[in-house]
Amino acid sequence: MKKYEAMVLSCIDPRFQPKVYKYLKVKKLTGKYSSFTIAGAAIGVTAKKFKKWHSTFFDNLSTSIKLHKINKLIVINHQDCGAAKIINGNKKFNLLIEKKIHKDSFRKIKKVINKKFPNLKISFKVLKLKD
């Protein structure tokens, strides 16, 4: 079985897909990663609001580690994220609040990854939708 480099966790937002592809191409990862796409990316797999989704992601990550021999998780969130707005509820929402939500989701996923998959490297990126 061929060894791949990583699993990429990214958001379902259609506006975001070309950005993810371009980012991974620049990183020379085309054809070298498995992919998991879910609303909010790290937000979707860590927020209590989306708890039912969490095990599905971690089961897929475990499968990719076994089948594809990956050694890294690349988490790519984006600005203007609808999932961030959903978990924020009806409260005031702005870029500063959204940055905190992304940061919290990265902290939470890193904690779980370090516990469940201690040998797995992890990287985080928040992409802008507009240049």
What are these regions (language model features)?
Residues 1-20, 39-53, 65-72, 82-131:
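Divalent-metal-activated hydrolytic enzyme cores
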Residues 21-27:
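Short Gly/aromatic-enriched secondary-structure transition segments
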Residues 24, 59-65:
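Short secondary-structure capping micro-motifs at structural edges
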Residues 27-30, 67:
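Short glycine/proline-enriched loop/turn "hinge" motifs that connect secondary-structure elements
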Residues 29-32, 119-121:
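A generic structural signal for alpha->beta connector loops
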Residues 31-41:
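A short beta-strand-loop structural module common to alpha/beta enzyme folds
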Residues 78-80:
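Short, ordered loop/turn segments at secondary-structure junctions
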